[in-house]
Amino acid sequence: MKRVLGIILGGGAGTRLYPLTKLRAKPAVPLAGKYRLIDIPVSNCINSEIHKIYILTQFNSASLNRHISRTYNFTGFTEGFTEVLAAQQTKENPDWFQGTADAVRQYSWLLEDWDVDEYIILSGDHLYRMDYREFIQRHRDTGADITLSVVPVGEKVAPAFGLMKIDANGRVVDFSEKPTGEALKAMQVDTQSLGLDPEQAKEKPYIASMGIYVFKKQVLLDLLKEGKDKTDFGKEIIPDAAKDYNVQAYLFDDYWADIGTIEAFYEANLGLTKQPIPPFSFYDEKAPIYTRARYLPPTKVLNADVTESMISEGCIIKNCRIHHSVLGIRTRVEADCTIEDTMIMGADYYQPYEKRQDCLRRGKPPIGIGEGTTIRRAIIDKNARIGKNVMIVNKENVEESNREELGYYIRSGITVVLKNAVIPDGTVI
């Protein structure tokens, strides 16, 4: 795969994942206790022997830059690199990135210098494990100009995706980005042609783009130069290219989740605790997911009841109950707490004993979960300070609420406590 260049799209402002994107770029959002979203496509690239990788971003990229530079530092003995390219203003391009295609266009001067045959364009907010070598080989075998990775989906989620129709040879003959109403119904197909059984085909009568593309190098450069007013791959570049180019579909038949919303992010993380076999597993030695080595001590569990949960390294868990939850690195849970259906992202550092005691003397909660606290159906962002006897249970069953001044939001009924938030003793949410 030395002839392939990887391009990962960092996405926009991450409004659907807000407030998790308040202080970080979307690809830098923590995942599964110890990873970040960006680790998924980068690891897939490395496992597929694609070692030349650019990541395009423009919002809150400081923590993403730090993570990439500390994690994916290829040695000087290979051409391999992983580099973040932030949006920039120039005389030729005075505006920020206007869309996915525009982001690639603004750096096309850099991309075209590489002596490669194909570009693989990836998204930074998906959870899946994929061998891109098979995907690229299919692209080459069919003589395609562009190949899209696709999945069959049902009617409920179909309007959120780019949908297509294909012929008997897998060629895309029609493409519609996020259709609704009659336009949606018009995109129904018999997905048995993809190998689904009749029952599955009935449940999933649409073919959706995963937002993952392989382009012949010159085809991509030509498309970007010809349509300078076209800023988005899904809405403009792909639908127009399907008319004049050989655009092929590649069926991906394993687990894949778009985790661009708070609800999808929450469900994907807690889905990792599913028994006996989760839909996605980080325990695969053949295709591991890489992240930064932090050299943390083992987790300390002191007389706790922990069931159906993932506990990351470096945690301190006292006499408490934890069920169906994910605890991130350096999470601290004090005695008599109940944590259920919750993702706790952990902390960036440990507070020394003296500082924790000083916080308690001043009436300010230290980092972690205080004694006697109950948390259900929530996401607790990093470095949050949850006081004693706090109830984070969405008592009023609120679906949406913006209480940033109090340190939390509610999204789709899920309470999201902000990074660095302070929730005082006795608070009820």
UniProtKB/Swiss-Prot annotation:
Task: Summarize subunit and interaction data from the UniProt record for this chain.
Answer: Homotetramer.
**Protein's UniProt name:** Glucose-1-phosphate adenylyltransferase
* NCBIfam families referenced in this protein's UniProt entry, alphabetically: glgC, PRK02862.1
Q: Gene encoding it?
A: glgC
Q: Which organism is it from?
A: Picosynechococcus sp. (strain ATCC 27264 / PCC 7002 / PR-6)
Q: What does this protein do?
A: Involved in the biosynthesis of ADP-glucose, a building block required for the elongation reactions to produce glycogen. Catalyzes the reaction between ATP and alpha-D-glucose 1-phosphate (G1P) to produce pyrophosphate and ADP-Glc.
According to its UniProt record, this protein's enzyme class is transferase
Reactions that this protein is recorded to catalyse: alpha-D-glucose 1-phosphate + ATP + H(+) = ADP-alpha-D-glucose + diphosphate
> Transferase as a keyword?
yes
**UniProt cross-references to CDD domains, sorted A to Z:** ADP_Glucose_PP (cd02508), LbH_G1P_AT_C (cd04651)
Which keywords does this Swiss-Prot/TrEMBL entry list?
ATP-binding, Carbohydrate metabolism, Glycogen biosynthesis, Glycogen metabolism, Nucleotide-binding, Nucleotidyltransferase, Transferase
Output the Gene Ontology terms for molecular function: ATP binding; glucose-1-phosphate adenylyltransferase activity; structural constituent of carboxysome shell
Q: What is its EC number?
A: 2.7.7.27
Q: Which domain of life is it from?
A: Bacteria
User: What does the entry list as the binding residues for alpha-D-glucose 1-phosphate?
Assistant: 162, 177-178, 209
Tell me where the transmembrane regions lie: none
Q: Name one GO biological process term.
A: glycogen biosynthetic process
Family of the protein in this entry: Belongs to the bacterial/plant glucose-1-phosphate adenylyltransferase family.
Q: In which pathway does it act?
A: Glycan biosynthesis; glycogen biosynthesis
This protein's GO cellular component annotations are: carboxysome
